[in-house]
């Protein structure tokens, strides 16, 4: 069994916040893959279903971000899971908007939700880091993550959520490379070779030049006058 945890804050007030992209990802997975209805358990909302051959539990902690580990730890102990059976999907300031990366273990990089999970289950769980970008100044971070996504973000956000959902069966199977390929097909689709873009500029054809005129034959050289004496001419005839 796999446990997928999406991080966020509960309530309509926070539903479209950047900090809640983990919740959004789980909602899309549940909808696209026919998971059961959400219900309250483990201090959060859970939904059960299958991704490929794997049984998967989706968990959205409702303890608020800074206490997410309480909910995750409770679910892990109930199902007797190892931390390596858990994948956490969360917002990532250090990735550009629309970028996604998978990571096994490691530090929490100051993310309060991850910090809480570290405290309750250790650091060996997997993560899916969903890039939201950085506001540029440390003091602006809190307001930035607790603000709704801008309208200009909607296109890339939709692509990311679709890619994560389509790749979720690979994620459940532990195949991070194929999961990332599914995401890439949505966030950076290959361009067809016969696309409608502007064709490359053609080199203009050079006008044909008329053939060079044939060289005229050299004029015949006029014979030189015979300067021999009559006697010499006679001698030369009998040589």
Curated annotation (Swiss-Prot):
Its main location: cytoplasm. TRNA binds at residues 14, 64, 66, 112. Its EC number is 3.1.1.29. PANTHER family: PEPTIDYL-TRNA HYDROLASE. Monomer. One of its GO terms (molecular function) is tRNA binding. This is Peptidyl-tRNA hydrolase. GO terms for cellular component: cytoplasm. PROSITE patterns: PEPT_TRNA_HYDROL_1 (PS01195), PEPT_TRNA_HYDROL_2 (PS01196). Residues 193-204 have a biased composition (Low complexity). InterPro entries: Pept_tRNA_hydro, Pept_tRNA_hydro_CS, Pept_tRNA_hydro_sf.
